C-alpha cells in the first residue's frame, strides 16, 4: 500500500498526469497519477490516505522547490495537472462525506484582470490540500464574490491581481467583503501585490506562492 502511495506522490511531484504524458522522460509509458490513484482505491487504500499520504506530500515537495527557486511555473502547472487527474477520482468521496473537506476556498481574479494561470495553480493546490474550491474565474466583480461568500458561510476568499491597474479593484473588493462579512479570511496574491499592500487594504494574508496559501489556511483553521 505504501509503495503505491509513494509512486503516486512522486508522479504528482514530477508532473506525471497519466501513462500517456510525455514528461518526465524517465517515466514515459509508466502509470501516472490518474492510473495510480485508481489502483490505490481499487486495492482498498482509503480516499483519505490517497489524499494525505499521496497527493498532498507530492504537491508540498514541488511547492518547496518553487519557493527555493528550484522549480518554476511550468513545473508547478504540470504538478497541479497531475494532482487534478487524481483528484477527479476522489471527488465522489468528498461529495458523499466519506472524506471531509477542511473548508471552502472561494477564489478569483479581480475585476478588469483576465490573467488566470496563478489563480488556477493556487486553486488546484488548495483543492489538493483537502479544501472545496469555488473558482469564480476572472474579471470578477465584488457582487459576485459576496454572493459566493453568503452561499458558503465561513469560507476563505483568495483574490488575484496580475496588473497594477487592477490592484485598486482588489482593494475595493476587500472593503466590500469587510463591510458585510468582517470575519472572512481574505488572501491576496499576484505579481504586483506585496505584503505591505495586503496590510494596507485590510486583507489577512499575502503569499507569493501557492504552498504559502495552503499553510496559512491550515493554520488559520487549526487556530479557529
Predicted feature residues:
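Long amphipathic alpha-helical segments
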Residues: 1-95
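Glycine/charge-rich, flexible interdomain linkers and switch-proximal surface loops
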Residues: 94-110
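Cofactor-cradling patches in redox/metallo enzymes
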Residues: 119-129, 134-203, 216
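Short acidic-hydrophobic, aromatic-tinged amphipathic segments that line or gate anion-handling sites
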Residues: 204-209
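Short alpha-helices
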Residues: 212
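A charged, well-structured terminal subsegment
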Residues: 216-224
